Amino acid sequence: MLTMSELAKAVVSKQNGNVSPKIKLEKDSVILFQGDSITDMFRKYDCNQCNTPEQMGMGYALFAASTLLSDYPDKQLKIYNRGVGGNKVYQLRDRWELDTLAIQPDVLSILIGVNDFWHILMGNYKGSLGIYERDLQDLLHYTKEKLPNVQLVLGEPFALRGGSAIDDAKWFPEFDGYRASLKKLADEF
């Protein structure tokens, strides 16, 4: 399993002539981006066709898909984005059958966790770091049970310090625990 930072290093490595052996793309591989608003980034929910800008949104999923489709045209990759703004891990699980398992991805990228923390701060959610880690671990075990050969890429949740939405005194260092938890799960899977 790769974290997003490792994926970025793999992309740079590939640009330098080295391809990461951790993610293997075959002809007709299906790649799925899953997560919250950072993944969603204004994608059109009514567009379910693979490889279209409308269903990719305007964020990292579009950038990654464009790069992969350009770099590997012979692979005829099928790339989807099913991020949903505001989602927490339990909400991913609620829609997992339709929005993940039905797609049968060969590579599954998940970026989730900001809302699991932020909604606690806002008083809208009674979660905790332990609930986040347990829910995500259970979801990953379930996914590997249903899709044993899926290659996982886990993105560390992040918050940009200094912006109007992030009060550093409220977010840090507690939010760093969510990142550490994700890293622990990435090492496990």
Predicted features, each with a name:
Residues 1-3:
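N-terminal export leaders
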Residues 38, 86, 159:
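Residue-level detector of flexible, active-site-proximal loop/helix-junction positions
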Residues 5-82, 97, 101-104:
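Serine-esterase "nucleophile elbow" of acetyl-processing enzymes
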Residues 25, 58-59, 63-78, 91-189:
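Alpha-helical cap/lid subdomain in secreted, periplasmic
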Residues 8-11, 84-89, 170-172:
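Short, flexible loop segments at the rims of nucleotide/cofactor-binding pockets, characterized by
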